[in-house]
């Protein structure tokens, strides 16, 4: 069993934060510090993101299982769970499978429905990168710009390189 990277802040009832697709725990650090005034906050890097392990299996049930393993490893019986976007889908899956482990569920920026693919160009851009042969982030940015015109989106993606 592989373990997730996480940041731990504050004291009190546990609040677990799950980031969105292509995000990391960094995205939630500012709010996590604020929430830590009232809760013991765990900000996770989900599988295939940030400093957590990478695996071919990438599904909501697998990620919900990662969350269960994390809670068991940290001796967290029950927690408030906040999930953003993809993290919201993971949180909803987890709450459905393990309702007795969820104190409060907060789902942000996504609903319990299927969505059509809308990251196609982003993934094409990412897959076009020849990572071993890139010499700089600027070079990666120039390649991504062929697929992704928004500077801010590219900078967000480059954080994971």
Predicted segment positions?
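Active-site glycine-rich loops that stabilize anionic/oxyanionic intermediates
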Residues: 11-12, 20-23, 85
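Active-site loop/oxyanion-hole signature of alpha/beta-hydrolase fold enzymes
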Residues: 29, 33-36, 42-86, 90
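Conserved alpha/beta-hydrolase catalytic His-Asp/Glu region
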Residues: 132-161
